[in-house]
Structures are given as structure tokens and as C-alpha cells.
Amino acid sequence: PIAGSMVLAAILLKLGGYGIIRMMQILPTTKTDMFLPFIVLALWGAILANLTCLQQTDLKSLIAYSSISHMGLVVAAIIIQTPWGLSGAMALMIAHGFTSSALFCLANTTYERTHTRILILTRGLHNILPMATTWWLLTNLMNIAIPPTMNFTGELLIMSALFNWCPTTIIMLGLSMLITASYSLHMFLSTQMGPTPLNNQTEPTHSREHLLMILHLIPLMMISMKPELII
């Protein structure tokens, strides 16, 4: 069910990050070198999840692996136990909660009209659902973490914290963000661009679907304008 996917991506997946934050408070803060294997493992897991996204043909699976890759960055930022790392992790968890939930909602909107989640079979929707294409563009840009969104703030804080802790981590972070941009653009182009299937009879988007997207993006934009609420 789409509601379960939205709750899982937006709330339940972030409970793991919250649990790690609480556990790190009782661990020694001066011996972060002992956590180096876990940080490398988290960043490597994020890269592998991003590479898995590139080879996905199922729209819902692609969005799910995207959530896993972002949580890898969150775990790495939490483990180094710095104020910037914790602030970036909190910002990225909240921002990606809204973004991934919105992407699952859009995937369901597409599935209800095409009855398939295969990327190549959902192409050409910009000709018949232009407003939905606008929502797809906005959510994909937020998934890429362009400024001035909260996603960008979180990733910038995480990148700065990890770079100050160990400069070589910038290689893995940069590679992860490059692949994130690649699969996000691939997802948008595969579902929206191209010729429209001739036998595809769809109905226009409803006000309920637009309201769902507004309720996802407006709070995220408001938090982006005043990040002091969570950082």
C-alpha cells in the first residue's frame, strides 16, 4: 500500500537514525577514530545503494533505494559526534522524510493511471499530465539537494563535518552525490519525457493529489526558510 510506503520512508526509516543519536550520547566522544570502519561502511553503503538505483527499472524500488542511500550519509554524520554532523543529520532526515514521501505519492499517482511501475512504460506523461510533471521536477530537485532547500543545508553540513574530520571522505561523498543527481535526472526523464504511448488512456490529476503534494512541499519550503527550528 502506498500509505505504508510513505510512512515507512518518512517516519519509520528515520527512527533508526534517532536511535543512533541517542546511543552515541553514552559512548566516548574522544575516541571517534574507533568508528572509522563504521563511517567508511556507511558511506560505501550509500554509494552501493545509489548504484543500485541506477539499474532499477521499477519506480517504487528506485525511490526506496534512494532513501537507503541518504540514510548512509546520516549515519556517517551521527557517528563522528560533532555539532555540525548532528545538525546536518537532523536536517537531512527531516528534509528527506518529506521528499521521499512525496516521491512515493507521485509514483502512486503514475501507477493509478498507467497500471505499471516500469520506468520505460510510464514515459511521456508531460504531454497529458503537465501539472504532475511540475511536481515531479520539484521533488527531484529537492532529492538532488539544490539550494536553498533543507536537503542542501543538511548535505552541506554533513559534507563539512566529515571533511573536517577526515578530508579523504570528500571523495566518497562527492561520488555519492554525483550518482544521486544522475539517478534523479534519470527517473525524471524516464517517467516524464519521450513519446506518449498510443494506447494510454489516462484521467487528469485530481485536487486531492495536488493537495497532497502541497502538504509535502510547503512545510519543507517553510523549514528551509527558517532552519533554526530544527538545527
Swiss-Prot record:
Its EC number is 7.1.1.2. It is an enzyme of class 7 (translocase). One of its GO terms (biological process) is electron transport coupled proton transport. Keywords: Electron transport, Membrane, Mitochondrion, NAD, Respiratory chain, Translocase, Transmembrane, Transmembrane helix, Transport, Ubiquinone. Core subunit of the mitochondrial membrane respiratory chain NADH dehydrogenase (Complex I) that is believed to belong to the minimal assembly required for catalysis. Complex I functions in the transfer of electrons from NADH to the respiratory chain. The immediate electron acceptor for the enzyme is believed to be ubiquinone. Belongs to the complex I subunit 4 family. This is NADH-ubiquinone oxidoreductase chain 4. It comes from Agkistrodon piscivorus piscivorus (Eastern cottonmouth). The lineage of its organism: Eukaryota, Metazoa, Chordata, Craniata, Vertebrata. The gene is MT-ND4.
